[in-house]
Swiss-Prot record:
Biological processes per GO annotation: bile acid secretion; estrogen metabolic process; flavonoid metabolic process; negative regulation of fatty acid metabolic process; retinoic acid metabolic process; vitamin D3 metabolic process; xenobiotic metabolic process
UniProt-annotated glycosylation sites, renumbered to this chain: 119, 142, 296, 348
Membrane topology (UniProt): Single-pass membrane protein
Gene this protein is translated from: UGT1A3
Cysteine disulfide links: none
Name of this chain's protein: UDP-glucuronosyltransferase 1A3
Length: 534
């Protein structure tokens, strides 16, 4: 019998031990994370946790004044000073939530909304200026030799920083207003069947909806320019040349979109676009004794989970009382995440909590419905766990999310400004008692979960891929290097049109010349014939 090389067992054990001890260091990398605060940060945290588990070092860079970003054991927190106090930050960024519940003239509300957005933009832009002009911090970041920047491009400052430091970048996002995600990836974006953000259109549009779909971005372009132009100016100042917002975004190696085609409509994609919808559903934990007790006390009726997201801390008293009245008319126990003033008519079946483990509760078999503002995190947690929704969209893409889920039969949408107590009561009874809502959301859940790779693993793979290969230039389309007229082949069309017109002109001239020659010769023959007859 043939025998191979025999390795002594102690040597083999020692070699294996060395391999295991060296391997993490050989593959470990340094990740600079520049997050967006709020719910955007919550799903990014899970990626950092997994990167840490795989031996990578993550440094989270954030202003010292923020909402949710605090030191944790799986990343290093680096903060920088800004000129805003915590009170000013809360007033400008969080102090506008009452606006969502106020009924007033459209123009008045529009201008108030614009003022609110301007204040928020001012906070983030000022923070960006102070970051990029912090020479000591920039030198430290440069010296650290990061392998990749992970950021949400809604924060254009981080994209400018990554480009300035010449570090490969991975974008982690849901979408960017004004179609900047399409422009930044050079992804085809026909308005004929791809609904624009904030239009609430579906992918099957009537003629007038297609008109709206085409005009809406044009109407928003001025607003978008006003908010994005300061970052382009800042980048131009840093690079000492003209830099556009699209130039800044095109630096990204990979785009990780927190979406998929269970929730979103089919659309073209580019090679460096990866879809990780439902990434926030990855880690479900056992419920605490407190919440288990609430569920056990609910009996056969089960529970309803109610949360309007991290940005809404209080609701106007009249609206809160109308909601409390409706909640008191259903047999289920309602767990309501609410930090505002307790409604005086709150029923015994409604429990107010300052925080709740939303995904863990939605995963419990006794959960019957989910009242949500239709933020993408909540909608995906509802899809993952198969819980029908009553949706109260408040701002941004929440209206689009609610429309999509309602179209798919997974829930009911209410206008939070116009709804009455009876409307909410009827909507809750519909999604709880009508089996079609549960069947539809379970079908979406089945489609969403039927995938070869979990979203969290996919996201981590691509971050590591960019670290290993120092970017992903082979996925970058050449469209980034074309001018607008080259991209649309207008120069080729113009050239071909000129050739066709030239050929047509020469052909016409030749025909005209030949015609004149033939006609002239024929005329001379006729004249000669007439002269002979005379």
């Amino acid at each position: 019998m043939a025998t191979g090389l025999q390795v002594p067992l102690p040597w083999l054990a020692t070699g294996l031990l060395l391999l295991l001890s060296v391997q993490p260091w050989a593959e470990s990398g340094k990740v600079l994370v520049v997050p967006i605060d709020g719910s955007h940060w919550l799903s990014m945290r899970e990626v950092l946790r997994e990167l840490h588990a795989r031996g990578h070092q993550a440094v989270v860079l954030t202003p010292e004044v923020n909402m949710h970003i605090k030191e944790e054991n799986f990343f290093t927190l680096t903060t920088y000073a800004i000129s805003w106090t915590q009170d000013e930050f809360d007033r400008h960024v969080l102090g506008h939530t009452q606006l969502y519940f106020e009924t007033e003239h459209f123009l008045k509300k529009f201008f108030r909304s614009m003022a609110m957005l301007n204040n928020m933009s001012l906070v983030y832009h000022r923070s960006c200026v102070e970051l990029l002009h912090n020479e000591a911090l920039i030198r430290h970041l440069n010296a650290t030799s990061f392998d990749v920047v992970l950021t949400d491009p809604v924060n254009l400052c981080a994209a400018v920083l990554a480009k300035y430091l010449s570090i490969p970048t991975v974008f982690f996002l849901r979408n960017i207003p004004c179609d900047l995600d399409f422009k930044g990836t050079q992804c085809p974006n026909p308005s004929s069947y791809i609904p624009r953000l904030l239009t609430t259109n579906s992918d099957h549009m009537t003629f007038m909806q297609r008109v709206k779909n085409m005009l809406y971005p044009l109407a928003l372009s001025y607003i978008c320019h006003a908010f994005s132009a300061p970052y382009a100016s800042l980048a131009s100042e840093l690079f000492q040349r003209e830099v556009s917002v699209v130039d800044i975004l095109s630096h990204a190696s990979v785009w990780l979109f927190r979406g998929d085609f269970v929730m979103d409509y089919p659309r073209p994609i580019m090679p460096n676009m990866v879809f990780i919808g439902g990434i926030n559903c990855a880690n479900r934990k056992p419920l605490s004794q407190e919440f288990e007790a609430y569920i056990n006390a609910s009996g056969e009726h089960g529970i309803v989970v109610f949360s309007l997201g991290s940005m809404v801390s209080e609701i106007p008293e009249k609206k809160a009382m109308a909601i409390a009245d409706a909640l008191g008319k259903i047999p289920q126990t309602v767990l309501w995440r609410y930090t505002g003033t307790r409604p005086s008519n709150l029923a015994n079946n409604t429990i107010l909590v300052k925080w709740l483990p939303q995904n863990d509760l939605l995963g419990h078999p006794m959960t019957r419905a989910f009242i949500t503002h239709a933020g993408s995190h909540g909608v995906y947690e509802s899809i993952c766990n198969g819980v029908p929704m009553v949706m109260m969209p408040l701002f941004g893409d929440q209206m689009d999310n609610a429309k999509r889920m309602e179209t798919k039969g997974a829930g009911v949408t209410l206008n939070v400004l116009e709804m009455t107590s009876e409307d909410l009561e009827n909507a809750l009874k519909a999604v709880i008692n009508d089996k079609s809502y549960k069947e539809n959301i379970m079908r979406l859940s089945s489609l969403h979960k039927d995938r070869p790779v979990e979203p969290l693993d996919l996201a981590v793979f691509w971050v590591e891929f960019v670290m290993r290969h120092k970017g992903a230039p082979h996925l970058r389309p050449a469209a980034h290097d074309l001018t607008w007229y080259q991209y649309h082949s207008l120069d080729v069309i113009g050239f071909l049109l000129a050739v066709v017109l030239t050929v047509a002109f020469i052909t016409f001239k030749c025909c005209a010349y030949g015609y004149r020659k033939c006609l002239g010769k024929k005329g001379r023959v006729k004249k000669a014939h007439k002269s002979k007859t005379h």
